Amino acid sequence: MELVTLGETMVCFVPREDGKLRYQSDFQMKIAGAESNCAIGLQKLGHSACWISRVGADEFGEFVKRSVRAEGVSISGVTEDGEHRTGVMFKQTLAGNETTVTYYREGSAASFLSPNDISDEQIKGAKILHLTGITPVLSDSCKKAVYRAIELAKGYHVPVSFDPNIRLKLWKGQDHTNLIRDLAGRADYLLMGREEAEYLYGTGESERLQAMLCRQGTVRYLAVKNGSQGAKVCSATELISIPPYPCHCIDPIGAGDAFNAGFLSGILEGKSLEECGMIGAVCGAMATQTRGDIEGYLSKEELARLLSGQKAAYR
């Protein structure tokens, strides 16, 4: 398995029309989860992926499993929990594409993920372990599971990819900054938004982040995503500006995960740092043009067509 990831995937109810939830009566049922999004994005780009999690032994849990499996991602690491329910969220889109989410996930099956759910076999055969800052703040057992996965990855020389994915709603008034910084410092590939960088390190300037994380730290590749402004990618010796890929943004949720999938696919294919950044930018941009987290994710063939048809900067 090329990529292994772990975290919660919820059932997401999406109104068919824009407006406040109080006025909605017609919803689509989809899935939402940063880690499974990345796994699905990578799978669409031609790479194998496995998702580790827990879901309730309920209809929503079955829907989540079927949906992830239908995208080609292995769910061999998913455990059914007969005592806790599958998490649920609602998405609301207002005028101007202002999107907000409401969670009903406290005490969910996935919040009981623990080191016992992580096996040597799952990690040692992987080429990349991908984690986010969402999972470790869900519960103490989830935090321990994340650290156990990293411990195994380091032991088997599996590179770790980490996206802070800061969700202050999940912090519940607690300060998890040091936790997220510690996890980021253990990553080989650190993929974060500019606002997250400012929150964690007091700066979004790529030169300072490069010095702090790549030269003084152990991060091999750093990507700082900045939405419509493009991205900066760097190593200890390179710092490259990635121009934004032109798109018409309809729904930005899931775009960061799509960038991650594209960037990591480049790594798996032995691409240069600049190429990894460009692939990530294209995948992230295209994901915003369709409503839903994963509906706009590119296939390997679609990505190749877009790259071959663009100006030199994207070839």
Language-model region placement:
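Short beta-strand scaffold segments in enzyme catalytic cores
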Residues: 40, 88-92, 230-233
